[in-house]
Each structure stands twice: as C-alpha cells, then as structure tokens.
C-alpha cells in the first residue's frame, strides 16, 4: 500500500510505499486485503476484568495474549491481563495513575515477564488520566489486591516529551518510544540493552 504522510499544517508532504513480509519473503498484502472471515480471527468473545475499553494488546511467542484495559468507573486504574486465546484471562495486575494505556509491550525474559508502559499520567479536567511523562519497565506480578502507583520498576524520563508510548523488539535489541512535543510526534530509538 501507498501511505501519504504530512505535517499537521501540511507544510511538508511525503508518500511512502509499505511492503509487509512474513519472514519467508512472501508479501502479506494479499492476505491482509482479503475479506474478513473466521480464519483471520485469533481470539474472540473474551470477557476482561471490567466492562470497559481494551486499549491495547500484545502476544507472546507462545501465543499468550496480554490485554491493557481502562478502569471504567475507576479512571485512575489500568488493568494488565494475561490469558490464552478464546479464554478469560487467568490473572491480572492493576496500575494506578499510569495514564491512558494507549500502548504497552511485553518483554519475555526466561519465565519472567516485564511490562513496558507509559507512566506518571496527568489527571485531565474530565477526571481521566493521560499524557504519561515517563516510561516504566515493570515485572509482571499479578495480585488482585494490590495497585502499583504512578510508576515502578525501572522508569525512564525523556526531557520535554510527554504522551510517551514504548515498543520493544528484543530480537533486534530495539526500544522505541513515541512521544509528543508541541504539534509533533517523535519516534526515538535506543538499544534495549542500554536501557536494561
């Protein structure tokens, strides 16, 4: 597909062609362009912890699904849930005041799992939390009776950036953080091993 790109004020324009490969040299464009059907569904009809929006998800190499869900009537909460496809999550942990949960990533380290997520969210006028100022790497510790506040684990601050969202690629030693400045969205790349 061809994707147009532009600055918010349209002062700079670009067009890029994107080709997606599945590692075998085959393009996935044909697969992704066919009509939606049951063969494309990985998991369905899963009830999460709250009757609220799932903000994002990740999938482990073994197929385990991870969900990030808003707290509903508890706007300061995010739920990180883990489970098998087509099944209710087996456990979860709660994060308080982290932000909106727009994105997160799961890092696999042997039998341990770590969550990379925006943290230190700001309370907005509508009572919701958003615009995280830091990124945290948290050891996944499911406990239904404990809430982790603001940040935890290893926490990283990028000066003059907000609304930060991490992504990782452990195979290629990449940590990417997308963040906002005034009117611009930045993509900042680091070696993951430098952060650890």
Predicted regions and their residues:
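A short beta-strand motif characteristic of beta-propeller blades
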Residues: 39-48, 88-95, 148-158
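Beta-strand-rich domains and repeat architectures in extracellular enzymes and scaffolds
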Residues: 43-76
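Repeated scaffold domains used in trafficking and secretory/extracellular systems
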Residues: 50-58, 96-107, 153-169
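Entry beta-strands of beta-propeller and related beta-repeat scaffolds
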Residues: 63-67, 110-117, 172-176
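Beta-propeller blade signature
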Residues: 76-86, 129-143, 186-195
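Blade-loop segments of beta-propeller domains
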Residues: 78-113, 119
